[in-house]
């Protein structure tokens, strides 16, 4: 009996892209194929929730293109859920996703910073303008701060902190809200985090608030009817995993430069662009991997920790994972740092002191 895919509800009422005609065409085409995308794919304007399967979720670098061209949508090698399963099965963790989008309306960042209500399940921190102004720099949580706090004053954007309510264990997500209606977001672990906090933020901006003095409505945005999620773009995904052995970075860098330089004849791995600076910079071998025009950085540390940064989607991470494993597997015996065996170490120490005790020293005779 075939196992049914797990379904979840997605609210598309704030998702917008393209003209009305193109949106309707996309709705019909996607519904016909039963491929209503969630995650980061910008969906059509729909007032009701849709039942969608996890198997159709895909992380893509440019959502409007996906929404306007079903063929591009179908060219992605793996679905979002399949890619996430691969990462989980291979203990690859997403550390952060950096992305941005547009809300389709201007925002009065000054009024927003001064009047937005801070709540634990919504916005918990606001930073705007002069960092010494308590009216526009407020928080209800205690967080670790930088040793040297920023002294720069920003008047074109508000920085807020929000935690995804769908996953309370997540750290706070840092969101920069700009006057022109753009958002820049860091700290998401997956696109569900993005969807959760963005929809909540839109509701806050759309509702505004009532003034305590005269009960007048304070508007945070210029056009509540046009606010939505437009042009979502993933800028970078950082991930990491751990090897079960330690790596001799010096040997690895030497091997790559010797056998995989620009004039290499190796066809399987080919040219590998790498840097290793033991003093200064990263204490790792920095390998650049080009995947379909997207240059991903792979950091190999002595501890066996591997960081993959600069990916635009999950398939970039998976491709970089296979590449670095191909390199490390070929030279495994040469680059692996053998662990010290305690019994052999103790035996060598005992032999050393035994030799020291057996030595005879000349004795001075006093006349």
From Swiss-Prot:
GO MF annotations, alphabetized: DNA binding
Keyword Cell inner membrane: no
Residue ranges with Polar residues bias: 16-26
InterPro entries: TBP_dom_sf
Segments of this protein annotated with the region Disordered: 1-26
Family to which the UniProt record says this protein belongs: Belongs to the TBP family.
Protein name, per record: TATA-box-binding protein-like
Taxonomic classification: Viruses, Varidnaviria, Bamfordvirae, Nucleocytoviricota, Megaviricetes
